[in-house]
Regions:
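A structural-propensity feature for long, helix-poor, extended segments
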Residues: 483-488, 493-496
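Anionic-ligand anchoring segments at beta-strand to alpha-helix junctions in alpha/beta enzyme folds, i.e.
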Residues: 459, 464-486
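Flexible beta->alpha loop and helix N-cap segments adjacent to enzyme active/binding sites
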Residues: 762-769
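Short, conserved secondary-structure segments in the cores of folded domains
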Residues: 375, 758-759
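Core nucleic-acid recognition elements
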Residues: 1-407, 412-426, 430, 434-442, ...
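C-terminal substrate/ligand-recognition segments
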Residues: 648-649, 653-657, 661, 668-671
Length: 769
């Protein structure tokens, strides 16, 4: 049954209930909805814009929980609908739909849980589900079938595809490059690792966790003596490690920019939460790169390429919605965004079209933890597997595999299903528990990972990889009873963390979770049999593989390419047009004022922000670095900055890498680094159109080698990073737009005194000459 409430602003709040509500309960809901009045009709006429019926919004999840906390029972779903004049009104088809009247069926999804399917034809299933499995991987799965003596289930094939996607396993970076007929001596990953091997400096953990950790200073920790109950606060000294991480969410942001960027920010925060046995995020960064937004007439440079029939969103919509999404998540979670960049670019030469039609959205940040907890523990048989966070929904299915290929290759339905939704409040609750456990004298966490691509199957298998584990599916929270076993196992719903905890500590952790209102579920245990399985209540296992079958033998990737020399015409300038050139340059999004990005995001929450973007009396966004303090009374802190040069990289990929590092370093130089360059570590995030055209793979190799060599010569390390190597957009008419090969470098390190950061504000000093 659905009740309709009309708010004072004329929107309609639809409330699904499992039973008839007492008049007192209806009055409570009316008060909760801002003195809304309940409609007596079961059906409402008119046109309304509201959420898609199959996607329960985060707003609904939180609203339903509020009703539960008020003592109301039987409320299942709450959504808001906005009246419009007619069906021609604009709305976002990714998240919303047009309703020609509201009735009792608006939440009905005519889907029954699909049964477990044993896959008879891997090739057909691969294409149908958009799994992006290679021929070699399918051959490998056929071998696994032979070893098992049975056909693989849809859950096993789907899960394997996500776990072993390029997005998750970075096969190109670990693969062998053969360029101009010659096998290269080192893989891309080996060249990046070389920087830390030769110059470890202060690095404690690199390349093996969700984040990189560098040795930090001793600072004060201000926290309750006991987090499981009301207690007094104490101050104690802790030996810290500094975390650095940057993540990209390019495909989801291209398809649905608000949730794509929002979940990108959320995922990067969870990466820092999931470092070691848990750590604390403190401040974020963001980068947006799109094609020209074409916001005004008369911007001649934007005519270099004709306007495309954009697959999902226009560049202007992406810039607005993506920055809204990243800002929204940080604001709701309580993480300030203190450093960032924006770039728009298109170019055409020799018949090749370059533009960020497949956009770049980078979410990065810095944080810290205790040196005690910076390395993960080793699981022992009988450890409990805990999931913390929200329910399972049909959201974010196949994101790992779909984001590993050109956007536009698969149907819009598959690509939309791969986009997650954001619920920052749920993530904050889970974080509060992790924070509490890390602040205690004895942290009970053995290991921790976040739920990202592939959901439970990826996260929980990583927790038990050394030992094997069994997950009881009836213990997992199900928000949508129509989910199949495959969808339960692999969805990316909401914000969730997987923890491995000693059995003796479960009760204590549950007390903390209850205080923080963080949903916590003990869903399984380590088994010691080197297998990983999901088991239904009836004993059927839709997923049951040996751990080494999941991780150990994915075929090696070979990248065969040849060097292609590309020549670009020299640009000619006329001195008589200097003023016109300046006028144009000042209009570029990369140059013009960024207050439309900074003014909508919290840049000071936590009380530890020493330097954010906006400076001077009128708070212009001028600062090139962000700086945070590590406690409330000390001077020690962390600085972070960014650098990129994709335009230069088009002409010379090696120069692009060097300039990206140089920009990050010249941006961070305004903060007093504790030990100079030895304090600085870099994250390198590579966005490249691999296999898009001849010569691109060779260009990537050149770019990575140049960055490695340059960092080694400067004696600095690159202990973390990420790659997104399918930066191509395909259109139904066959047109292919290639994103320029791009490396974004994030710098971070310890600051000796956060009060001595040089400001970009010029001061009129009468004593100066």
């Amino acid at each position: 049954m659905i009740l309709f409430f009309r708010t004072p602003t004329k929107s309609v709040i639809a409330t699904e209930v499992s039973q008839e509500l007492a008049s007192e309960d209806i009055q409570k809901l009316s008060w909760l909805y801002g003195e809304a009045t309940v409609e007596n009709e079961e059906n409402l006429k008119g046109c309304f814009i509201g959420p898609r019926r199959e996607m329960i919004t985060p707003w609904s999840t939180n609203a339903v929980e509020i009703t539960q906390n008020m003592g109301l029972t039987g409320v299942l779903r709450i959504e808001e609908y906005f009246p419009v004049k007619d069906e021609n009104a604009e709305y976002d088809p990714m998240l919303q739909r047009m309703y020609k009247g509201l009735n009792q069926e608006i939440f009905t999804v005519n889907i029954k849980p699909q049964p477990i399917v044993h896959i008879e034809n891997l090739e057909e299933y691969n294409e149908k589900e958009g799994l992006a499995l290679s021929r070699e991987e399918m051959d490998y799965l056929l071998k696994v079938e032979k070893d098992l003596g049975r056909k693989l289930t849809d859950s096993e094939v789907f899960g394997f595809a996500q776990i072993n996607s390029e997005h998750c396993r970075h096969k190109i970076f670990g693969g062998t490059f053969i360029i101009d007929g010659q096998e290269m001596e080192s893989s891309l990953f080996q060249m990046i690792k070389k920087t830390t091997a030769e110059n470890p400096n202060k690095i404690i953990s690199a390349y093996k966790d969700n984040v990189a950790f560098a040795e930090g200073p001793i600072v004060e920790q201000f926290s309750p003596a006991d987090h499981s109950t009301s207690d007094y606060f104490i101050i104690k000294d802790i030996k810290t490690v500094i975390s650095l991480k940057a993540e990209t969410h390019n495909f989801p942001t291209t398809v649905e920019p608000f949730n794509g960027a929002s979940t990108g920010t959320g995922g990067e925060i969870r990466d820092r939460m999931g470092g070691g046995k848990g750590s604390w995020p403190i401040a974020g960064t963001a980068v947006y790169m799109t094609s020209y937004p074409r916001t005004d007439e008369g911007r001649e440079w934007e005519d270099i390429l004709p306007v495309r029939q954009w697959l999902y969103q226009t560049p202007e919509q992406i810039l607005i919605k993506a920055s809204n999404g990243a800002s929204d998540f940080g604001n709701k979670f309580g993480q300030p965004l203190i450093c960032g960049s924006v770039l728009t670019f298109e170019h055409q030469e020799n018949g090749e079209k370059y533009a960020y039609d497949k956009v770049i959205m980078l979410a990065g940040g810095v944080g810290y933890g205790t040196q005690r907890d910076c390395l993960k523990g080793h699981p022992e048989k009988g450890n409990k597997v805990v999931v913390m966070g929200g329910d399972n929904y049909r959201i974010g299915l196949g994101g790992g595999s779909v984001s590993s290929v050109e956007t536009g290759r698969y149907s819009s339905g598959i690509e939309l299903n791969a986009v997650q939704r954001a619920n920052a409040e749920m993530q904050k609750r889970a974080y509060n528990v992790v924070r509490a456990l890390c602040e205690e004298d004895n942290n009970p966490i053995v290991s921790i990972h976040d739920h990202g691509s592939a959901g439970h199957v990826n996260c929980l298998s990583e927790l038990v990889e050394e030992n094997g584990g069994l997950i009881h599916m009836d213990k997992l929270p199900i928000g949508d009873q129509t989910l199949s076993a495959k969808e339960i196992i692999a969805n990316e719903s909401q914000e969730r963390m997987g923890l491995l905890i000693d059995e003796s500590a479960i009760e204590h952790v549950q007390k903390i979770a209850d205080r923080e209102r963080a949903p916590m579920y003990t869903v399984g245990e380590t088994t010691g049999d080197a297998r990983f399985a999901f088991e239904q209540a009836d004993g059927v296992r839709p997923f049951d593989l040996a751990v080494d079958q999941m991780f150990g033998s994915s075929p090696k990737t070979y990248m065969v390419d040849k060097t292609v020399e590309r020549h670009y015409e020299n640009v000619s300038y006329e001195t008589s047009k200097l003023n016109e050139y300046i006028r144009r340059v000042l209009q570029l999004e990369a140059v013009a004022c960024k207050d439309w990005l900074t003014n909508k995001v919290d840049r000071s929450v936590t009380g530890k922000i020493a330097r954010q973007q906006c400076q001077g009396e009128i708070q212009l966004p001028l600062s090139d670095c962000g700086v945070v303090a590590l406690d409330y009374r000390g001077e020690k802190g962390i600085a972070t900055s960014l650098g990129h040069a994709p335009q230069a990289a088009l002409a010379n990929p090696a120069a692009g890498s060097v300039l990206s590092v140089a920009e990050a370093l010249t941006n961070i130089v305004w903060a007093p680094m504790a030990e100079g360059l030895d304090s600085v570590s870099l994250s390198a995030n590579w966005m490249w159109p691999c296999r898009a055209q001849e010569g691109e793979d060779a260009r990537l190799y050149t770019a990575v080698k140049a960055l490695s060599d340059f960092c080694c010569s400067l004696q600095i390390n690159v202990p973390t990073g990420k790659d997104s190597l399918s930066m191509t957009q395909k259109y139904p008419n066959g047109e292919k737009i290639i994103s320029p090969g791009t490396v974004i470098v994030s710098a971070g390190g310890e600051v000796s005194d956060v009060k001595k950061v040089v400001s970009p504000v010029l001061v009129n000093d009468e004593k100066s000459t």
